[in-house]
A protein has these predicted regions:
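Conserved SAM-binding loop
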Residues: 96
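Class I SAM-dependent methyltransferase "Motif I" SAM/SAH-binding loop
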Residues: 64-68
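Conserved beta-strand/loop positions that form the S-adenosyl-L-methionine
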Residues: 63, 86
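S-adenosyl-L-methionine
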Residues: 1-59, 70-76, 100-125
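Conserved beta-strand signature within the Rossmann-like core of class I S-adenosyl-L-methionine
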Residues: 162-169
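Class I S-adenosyl-L-methionine
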Residues: 176-181, 185-214
Length: 214
């Protein structure tokens, strides 16, 4: 049911005991997975569109944007920014494009794997003004910690993109780990707090709010 979603269940009751070791390993060993050709092409295309339509505008990245509802929200609320929404699913992006009544000129939806897209941004020397990670897959099993973004070897590249970094989740442990990872890797403050927005930015957020999650 729409208003009956559950908080992720896990045997973990706190920050994963191996997360610090994982972070230290990733900090000392650059992630060298080869880029997929389709990700290179998608990145090059999005870079060309940004430079052609909004050169010099600060960039907001909406990673894992799904149907792009959050990207559309950001583009309308930050008209002086260029918003790039990235998702690996072509069908989700197509569904979002079809459902949008009006398409802002400062919005681009890109089909790509964010693991490659983040590294390509970093390699190109592009720095973000804002970066959103809205309700990423929490991978709640303790054995899946390395699949969470903060446990993934790409995490240092994500942090190198700078800007205001905002992550939302309905699992408190995910946010606690994310903040721990940011602090350990950057020596900068990161705070997790309860948040009840006036309007939902994503279908997941709408569902979680209807279920009373904070």
């Amino acid at each position: 049911m729409f208003g009956n979603s559950r908080v992720p269940e896990s045997v973990q009751g706190d920050i994963h005991p191996h997360l610090a070791t994982l972070l230290d390993r990733h900090a000392g060993a650059p992630f060298r997975k080869p880029y997929a050709d389709y990700n290179r092409a998608a990145f090059a295309g999005s870079l060309e569109r940004w430079q052609r339509t909004a050169a010099g505008s600060p960039v907001i990245l909406d990673s894992g944007c799904g149907v792009g509802e959050s990207s559309l929200y950001l583009a309308r609320n930050f008209p002086d920014h260029y918003v790039i929404g990235v998702d690996q699913s072509a069908s989700r992006l197509a569904r979002g494009r079809r459902s949008a009544a009006q398409w802002p000129p400062n919005l681009d939806l890109v089909r790509a794997d964010v693991v490659d897209y983040w590294r390509l941004l970093r390699e190109a020397g592009i720095r973000l003004d804002r970066h959103y990670l809205l309700y990423p897959n929490p991978w709640p099993k303790a054995s899946q910690v390395s699949r969470r973004w903060h446990g993934h070897p790409v995490f240092p590249s994500l942090l190198d993109l700078s800007g205001v970094l905002e992550c939302r989740s309905n699992w408190a442990i995910y946010l606690a780990e994310f903040c721990f990872a940011v602090r350990r890797m950057t020596q900068r403050p990161a705070v997790a707090e309860s948040y009840a927005p006036d309007a939902a930015m994503t279908p997941f957020e709408r569902k979680y709010l209807a279920s009373g999650h904070r």
